[in-house]
A protein has these predicted regions:
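Catalytic-pocket segment enriched in acidic/His residues
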Residues: 1-127
Length: 127
């Protein structure tokens, strides 16, 4: 589907290892979503979900059809069989304790570019 509700938002995900540089592991776009947000909202409500003003609706993993646009480490590392090489030479099949995951997004047209900033989190060991 390629309608006007499929927003053109560039997305980027990076992993920063402890005391190291970050590596961009995914560049995708929100327009790659199979269902747009209007369709996802309709799907929720038709199945009885009581959506109310202020509720947060999340899209889930956003993946493209090219390897650089895969949206999860399971896809990026091909179920752990193809590790990615980090800037220091170490490899990752999945995210490790101590890694920082960084996500960024921007949208633009011919006249203006809007940045959504970045969100990042440090992956802590399980208790």
């Amino acid at each position: 589907y390629n309608g006007d509700k499929h927003y053109d938002i560039d997305l980027e995900v990076a992993i920063k290892i402890p005391n190291g540089e970050e590596k961009i592991v995914s560049k995708s776009n929100f327009k790659n979503m199979y269902w747009n947000m209007n369709q996802q909202l309709a799907h929720h409500t038709i199945n009885g979900c009581d959506i109310r003003c202020g509720d947060l609706l999340a899209s889930g993993t956003i993946s493209g059809d090219q390897k650089e646009a895969f949206g999860s480490m399971l896809e990026i590392s091909w179920k752990g069989t193809q590790p990615i090489t980090m800037p220091d030479g170490s490899t990752r099949k999945f995210i490790n304790d101590g890694d920082t995951v960084i996500m960024r997004g921007t949208a633009q047209n011919k006249d203006i570019k809007i940045g959504f900033g970045e969100v990042s989190t440090l992956v802590l060991p399980a208790k």
